[in-house]
Amino acid sequence: MINRKQGCIINISSIWGEIGASCECLYSITKAGVDALTKSLAKELGPSNIRVNSIAPGIINTRMNNHLSDEEKEDIKEDIPLEKIGEPEDIAKCVEWLIEDNYTTGQVISINGGWSI
């Protein structure tokens, strides 16, 4: 990418990197580290026209969350302003946008239905 003077790196972090999760300290710390890495690399690689961004999903309807009971999912939805759990397509649309865009770098984009506000 550096030799070609162009590129796009998209990291995946998590809402827990921003707000922290009880009983998930290590997970939260590593996701916050991904966000810091994203910003640092954006500064370092920007002169080579390489954009670096991160997507921080909230609760998304994936296998990772299959362990949640229906009751737990309903409790979570109550804390989300859009009152729903995200779908993988929500993340995919953001990835597509970041690939096509040519001026966004160093950003951590939260896709969580407003949960982090």
For each predicted feature, which ranges?
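Short, flexible catalytic-loop segment of classical short-chain dehydrogenase/reductase
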Residues: 18, 52, 56-67
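A short helix-coil junction within the Rossmann-fold of NAD(P)-dependent oxidoreductases
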Residues: 1-8
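C-terminal substrate-recognition "lid" of short-chain dehydrogenase/reductases
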Residues: 84-111, 116
